[in-house]
Amino acid sequence: VSDDPSNLEFQPRAKGSVMGFPAHEGRPGALGEVHARPHPLIEKPRVLVQLAFMTEGGSGVDHAVLSELSRRLGIAAPDRQARHHAMKWGKGSLRWERHTEFSTYLWEGPLSESGRSHEDTPFGNGFSPPGTVISGIRLEIRKWTPTSERLIAAFDPTSLCYSLVERGNAAIVTDFRQDGDGMTRILVLDRGLTPARTGALSQRLIDIETYRTLAMLGLPLALTLSGRARRIEDRLAQTTLEMKVAETRDSQTLLADLTELAAELEADAASSLYRFGASRAYD
């Protein structure tokens, strides 16, 4: 604002400032993160195929995969520090995102009304996975018609999940089963969603299935530690009983037993800290 308080015309602010005050250096990145994952605009009918890979090899493996895909298209590869990237692929588009311990490759393309997809995903010959697959999703978006309703019969009725969303303008169908390609199938029947709402709904469904699978990575470890915890409890109870009734064992021996139990318990807690923390974050 000009020096004259009666003049309400706003003058250009200094770059990196808020109301004339210096902005924190991390503020642009923090604000930009809100817009890092915009919902795609999706016209129907459409098919989305996403694979999520565990990236134990680090971000360099993803960059090598993206560089090869870019080379095949004759375009520039993304920056090594990039966390997301998009490119045209065939009749659709490919979006990549890097997360803490996994990365996702999402291909979106056309789907004919007859039920046949024109899929030319990058996941065919020549695609080098950056790690092992933890989640695979195939999501089809179709107009809600009597013909498309018949596709519900292809899902397992014993585990069928059917939900009406968006005030009844769309239905979500899945059975959480995997098809012959190992993909979890989701069907969205649409009778009035805008491309923006369709994109937002699709992204949420894909995120739910991806994070559901990642959260369950802690289950095998929890089952293993559950048995170990029971054994530690039994040994602690036995040692405590000996402290009360046995006169033959000296205090140093009992103390050594207790110390060993404490160390074993602490080691198990430390080894599970990251996995359980990740499961809570994914939940």
Residue ranges and their predicted role:
Residues 79, 214, 235-245, 267, ...:
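Intrinsically disordered or highly flexible coil/loop and linker segments, enriched in small
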Residues 253-283:
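Membrane-associated alpha-helical segments
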Residues 97, 107-257:
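Extended alpha-helical interaction modules
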Residues 1-140:
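N-terminal pre-transmembrane cytosolic regions of membrane proteins
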Residues 105, 162, 211, 274-276, ...:
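Sequence-level detector for tyrosine residue identity
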